[in-house]
Amino acid sequence: MSDNFYDVLGVSRDASEEEIKKAYRKQAAEHHPDVSDDDDAEERFKAIQKAKEVLTDEQKRQQYDQLGHDRFTEADKRGATGGGGPGGAGGPFGGAGGAGGAGGFEDIFNQFFGGGGGRGGGGGNRPRQGQDLRTGLTIDLEEAFEGATKEVTLTRPTQCDTCDGAGHPPDADVETCSQCNGRGQVQQVQQTPLGRVQQTSTCPRCEGSGELYSEDCADCGGDGVVREEATLSVEIPAGIRSGQSLRMEREGAPGENGGPNGDLLIEVDVDVGDRFERDGDDLRVNEAVSFPQAVFGDTIEVETVDGSVEMDVPTGTQSGETFRLKGKGMPRLRRRGRGDLYVKVGVVIPDSLNEEQREALEAFAEAGGEDVDVGGGFFKKLKSSF
């Protein structure tokens, strides 16, 4: 597999962001370690994630195209790529975000390739996608088995309707920022490992807009966003496991300068309950059988997630033996077939016997040539043998 990020996702160099995301979803679904049986599935999935991370970030993609794969990767290892996320959050490679712009190597790249962050670490007034948001959702085993439609409620940032995200009333007085002279960026000389360079960064006074307004929006306080409660309907695919996440596109934080919303990532927790244990797509369950059933063999009913099935208990079954019911486990996520159900048998030894049962077991012991103390030791011995 080629290391080139475009080749990893199978897209051309002029692919749009939507084409890249579509290719990522296809590759991720095919090569996720929980889905693929390939030995290198985990490493390949990491490469797919990395390729998507870089190529869907406008600034990182520009750096990648300018530097090439090898030089970009080396710069990445030194923490020299990427920028801060919206709202001042640090980028995935350690670049600082926030209204003051990024620092270090990111500023060098900005100087070389035309950077300068806008509000919240953006790039001038270019449209920027909003942050991805995360939340959790708990479902039961039956819902994970069948798939379900669930509702998730969260409080999230959304564009302020009062000012349409501008952060100020439409009739507010506006003046050109005197610190950057309306450019939204300021320049300064910084000492770096490459020597003294002139860097361009976001104007700290106007946060990259180049303008100052006489008053802020009363509802959002100038941020352009407010926090609201939202209830969303999410489709749960059959076979999902605890720890896996579902992505709802464009349900995240609002973008900047007309950019699209981020995505909402929903981490699923599957409550298996008390009866079953889950191991990937397989299930495990304990079933009790009587002493005569274990000795003579029998057919018993075993409850599965989707109903009961018959299972043969062979003659002479020992307590602790495990039997496999093929295809009676969980559905394989986005693949055909199901896992297996493993049934561990436990032989139940009676605590007390009536006279007829006692005589029968005494005869059983004598027929086997066992010299036992029927008054108490025999049954203790019998229990301990199971």
Curated annotation (Swiss-Prot):
Subunit structure: Homodimer.
Protein's UniProt name: Chaperone protein DnaJ
Keyword RNA-binding applies: no
InterPro entries reported in the protein's UniProt record: DnaJ (IPR012724), DnaJ_C (IPR002939), DnaJ_domain (IPR001623), HSP40/DnaJ_pept-bd (IPR008971), HSP_DnaJ_Cys-rich_dom (IPR001305), HSP_DnaJ_Cys-rich_dom_sf (IPR036410), J_dom_sf (IPR036869)
One GO location term (cellular component): cytoplasm
Biased composition (Basic and acidic residues): 22-35, 43-79
Renumbered ranges of CXXCXGXG motif repeats: 160-167, 177-184, 203-210, 217-224
Ranges of biased composition (kind: Gly residues): 80-104, 113-125
UniProt record similarity statement: Belongs to the DnaJ family.
